[in-house]
């Protein structure tokens, strides 16, 4: 497991009974988490006294209750600054477990010894884009949601990177990659967080289990002749990490060599000293030693 254990402004205080108790800066929140299936005692007072709890409804969706948190605030991760805005579907704007991947990407870029061009697909609010730019990379940030790209720009500005070489693209990721291939554009690193399920711009259905292999084949076409790394997140519980490794090995390693590794991402739980699993990340690197820079459990 790759642990995101360098946070100061975020803390997973406790988890269990399908929820997590978290500190975001000075705000205490309770949010649903399907992985927290254990029925452990709730001794921390934050379970009862907090700034907001997201409660699921019986008909789907849900809402924030007992809200005393502001509409937005910022938290820091090192020199990165992120704007937190609790949304209608439990999310806050960043996934703190991804910090392990930000650290990995920044380390790869800083040790590359050459300019690195990063393509960030399904890039959401741009935490990875901002992290890579802070390490000196030029970044192409792509997401189909205009609001998410605007939020990502805010994060870049808050981090003092409003003038960094980041291209902000609102587009369907597959269509954009197809056009980049036709243009002859190439990238040294790719980060992608494809959804489990979705619909394309003309209504076509995306299912991760069915579309992941051809999508990896597609993005391999924009890699440079000297690629540095690929990070791919998969949150689909039915997709085994070894299956994703197999895809990366047969598509990327077959073409470029290198090394592929898949592990769970995790957040340390203060109350128990254990770790909450938060999905799977697959990393391909040109060097078999590259993943050793990460913190593992």
PLM segments and residue spans:
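Mobile active-site "lid"/loop adjacent to the S-adenosyl-L-methionine
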Residues: 146-148, 170-174, 187-218
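C-terminal catalytic and target-recognition region of SAM-dependent MTase-like enzymes
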Residues: 227-297
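Conserved SAM-binding loop of SAM-dependent methyltransferases across substrates and taxa
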Residues: 125-137
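Non-catalytic substrate-recognition/targeting regions of SAM-dependent transferases
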Residues: 6-22, 29-96, 103
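Conserved SAM-binding motif I beta-strand of class I
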Residues: 138-143
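S-adenosyl-L-methionine
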Residues: 145-191
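Conserved class I S-adenosyl-L-methionine
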Residues: 115-124
């Amino acid at each position: 497991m790759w642990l995101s254990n360098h946070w100061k402004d975020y803390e997973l205080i406790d988890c269990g009974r399908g929820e997590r108790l978290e500190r975001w800066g000075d705000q205490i929140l309770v949010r649903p988490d399907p992985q927290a299936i254990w029925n452990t005692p709730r001794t921390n007072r934050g379970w009862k006294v907090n700034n907001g709890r997201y409660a699921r409804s019986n008909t789907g969706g849900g809402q924030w209750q007992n809200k005393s948190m502001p509409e937005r605030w910022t938290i820091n991760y090192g020199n990165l600054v992120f704007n937190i805005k609790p949304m209608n579907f439990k999310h806050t704007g960043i996934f703190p477990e991804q910090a392990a991947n930000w650290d990995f990407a920044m380390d790869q870029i800083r040790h590359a010894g050459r300019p690195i061009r990063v393509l960030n697909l399904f890039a959401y609010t741009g935490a990875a884009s901002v992290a890579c730019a802070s390490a000196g990379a030029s970044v192409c940030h792509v997401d189909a949601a205009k609001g998410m790209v605007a939020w990502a720009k805010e994060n870049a500005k808050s981090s003092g990177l409003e003038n960094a070489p980041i291209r902000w693209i609102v587009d369907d990721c597959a269509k954009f990659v197809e056009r980049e291939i036709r243009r002859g554009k190439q990238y040294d690193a790719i980060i992608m967080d494809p959804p489990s399920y979705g619909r394309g711009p003309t209504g076509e259905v995306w299912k991760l289990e069915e579309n992941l292999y051809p999508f990896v084949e597609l993005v391999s076409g924009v890699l440079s002749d000297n690629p540095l790394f690929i990070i791919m997140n998969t949150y689909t519980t039915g997709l085994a990490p070894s299956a994703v490794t197999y895809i990366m090995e047969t598509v990327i390693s077959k073409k470029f060599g290198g090394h592929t590794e898949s592990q769970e991402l995790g957040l340390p739980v203060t109350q128990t000293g254990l770790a909450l699993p938060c999905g799977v990340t697959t990393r391909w690197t040109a060097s078999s030693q590259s993943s050793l820079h990460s913190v593992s459990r």
